[in-house]
Design a protein with these regions (language model features):
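N-terminal auxiliary segments of SAM/dcSAM-dependent transferases
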Residues: 1-86
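Phosphate/oxyanion-binding active-site loops and adjacent basic polyanion-contact surfaces
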Residues: 60, 87-94, 236-243
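Conserved alpha-helix/loop element of class I SAM-dependent methyltransferases that forms part
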Residues: 68-72, 90-118
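Conserved class I S-adenosyl-L-methionine
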Residues: 112-126, 142-143
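Conserved SAM-binding loop of SAM-dependent methyltransferases across substrates and taxa
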Residues: 126-140
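Glycine-rich phosphate/diphosphate-binding loop of Rossmann-like nucleotide-binding domains
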Residues: 139-147
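S-adenosylmethionine
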Residues: 147-149, 161, 165-260
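Conserved SAM-binding loop
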Residues: 155-156
Length: 260
């Protein structure tokens, strides 16, 4: 079995994931299907005799996310529109756990928990995944920003239906990241962000096709809906590097209001 096949089909113990990550072991599809029966329509036995999912089917991935969020985090209602970014839950959980370790460094090695820990998610998307995991794992309170009105609407619906009390704020001016979001008297312990990676729509499309070709071995035209994402979720002028530089430059104005 190739390394690529292993990573996609086997889902053995994921040694590179954070020790506190709930997704360190192979997906238990029996339990996940019990949470979300429709997921069973997308689970099959591969040539190695292992239960697996078609991770290039956007609906299958969304159903997997729904089941993982319900089984591991108690999230009963989670849905996003077709064409919006559907993030891998294990990787996003890893981010939150390492962020918790970062906060522990300023707290005598103890991870701070509870609503007194205030976090800011820049560009939360329709999925609102960082605030969900941060709330469920550590009970942190969250403000989450987004420039896309439809994403805000969906994220608010997720928050309300699961009683998460996430404060979702629309960024009305896409030139800014923190301006218009952080209030004058607000203090945040942590800022998280999954920035747009690509520098243009063409870059995003090319990356999508490369992933399909390299990981699935199919011609690009055979599967063109594998990786979701709105343009603001996938690309911005100058790409990830430009976004982060802008973020750093603007953060100077809030150096006394944000710890990390």
């Amino acid at each position: 079995m190739s390394k690529t096949d292993e990573s996609i089909t086997n889902a053995e113990v994921k040694s590179k994931l954070h020790p506190r990550n709930k997704h360190n072991t192979r997906y238990d599809f029996k339990k996940l299907i019990a949470q979300t029966p429709e997921l069973g329509n997308h689970v099959a036995i591969n040539k190695y005799g292992i239960e697996t999912l078609d991770f290039f089917n956007s609906n299958a991935v969304k159903l997997l996310n729904q089941s993982l969020l319900k089984f591991d985090y108690g999230i009963d209602h989670w849905d996003i529109p077709d064409g919006f970014l559907c993030p891998p839950i294990p990787g996003r959980a890893d981010y939150i756990h390492y962020a918790a370790d970062l906060l522990a460094k300023e707290n005598n090695g103890i991870i701070p928990k509870g609503a007194s820990v205030k976090c800011l998610d820049i560009g939360t998307g329709a999925n609102c995944i960082y605030p969900i995991i941060g709330t469920c794992e550590y009970k942190w309170s969250w403000v989450a920003s987004e420039i896309e009105p439809k994403s805000i609407t969906m994220a608010k619906a997720i928050s309300k239906s699961n009683n998460l009390n996430i404060d979702l704020r629309l960024q009305s001016d896409s030139k800014y990241i923190f301006d218009g979001i952080i209030a004058e008297d607000e203090i945040f312990d942590l800022t998280v962000c999954n920035p747009p990676f690509h520098a243009s729509e063409e870059d995003a499309i090319s990356s999508n096709l490369r992933k399909i070709k390299n990981l699935k071995g199919k011609k690009p035209q055979e599967s063109n809906a594998s990786f979701g994402g709105q343009h603001n979720e996938l690309w911005c002028k100058g790409g990830e590097l430009r976004f982060l530089k802008d973020m750093i430059a603007e953060s100077i104005n809030y150096k006394d209001q944000v710890l990390w």
